Amino acid sequence: MVNKRMQTLLMQLRQQGIHDERLLQAIEAVPRERFVDEALAHKAYENTALPIGAGQTISQPYMVARMTELLQLTPTSRVLEIGTGSGYQTAILAHLVDHVCSVERIKGLQWQAKRRLKQLDLHNVSTRHGDGWLGWQSRGPFDAIIVTAAPPEIPDALLEQLDEGGILVLPVGEQFQTLKYVQRRNNEYHIETVEAVRFVPLVKGELA
């Protein structure tokens, strides 16, 4: 039954314009039901966002795929994720690159995500409890940065931690949000608007 629902989801993603086969294989390899509450497991393969507690959500599979595809990852890409959340996006990234760094401001979510990733034998992830606005400077610079919550403006620290040629993908805005694609070229930042989106806000600071 799960396999059938997964195949339906993959078909929907292809119909929505996701064509990177390596990415689709990574999505197929990650059991989304493991990243949501048991009571919501029957909705795991619906193309919708779901609550994960602490006022946070696991993103819609299309948005996970769209943002990941925009990063143009190779196996050796150095990747930073801001907002570990449930760990689902992290797991997709871990199937695509050699190592992932991920920052989560809510300690309980970080701990749960770390446990889930370990249970799935995904050991190529470093998680950190901290303020996502600050990135993870000691692990940078990064070839790709993905942000899974929306700041009102692009955090300077994330721009600074982007390597030459690197790509930053994030939602930006408050009441109205758009997905931004940022590439650093010749020490300049080229910003494109991709589409309208709706994410939880990227809050400064960290919670125990």
From Swiss-Prot:
It catalyses: [protein]-L-isoaspartate + S-adenosyl-L-methionine = [protein]-L-isoaspartate alpha-methyl ester + S-adenosyl-L-homocysteine. Its EC number is 2.1.1.77. It is found in: Cytoplasm. InterPro entries: PCMT, SAM-dependent_MTases_sf. Keywords: Cytoplasm, Methyltransferase, S-adenosyl-L-methionine, Transferase. The active site is at 59. GO terms for molecular function: protein-L-isoaspartate (D-aspartate) O-methyltransferase activity. GO terms for cellular component: cytoplasm. Pfam families: PCMT (PF01135). One of its GO terms (biological process) is protein repair. PANTHER family: PROTEIN-L-ISOASPARTATE O-METHYLTRANSFERASE, PROTEIN-L-ISOASPARTATE(D-ASPARTATE) O-METHYLTRANSFERASE. Catalyzes the methyl esterification of L-isoaspartyl residues in peptides and proteins that result from spontaneous decomposition of normal L-aspartyl and L-asparaginyl residues. It plays a role in the repair and/or degradation of damaged proteins. HAMAP family: PIMT. Belongs to the methyltransferase superfamily. L-isoaspartyl/D-aspartyl protein methyltransferase family. This is Protein-L-isoaspartate O-methyltransferase. It comes from Yersinia pestis. The lineage of its organism: Bacteria, Pseudomonadati, Pseudomonadota, Gammaproteobacteria, Enterobacterales.
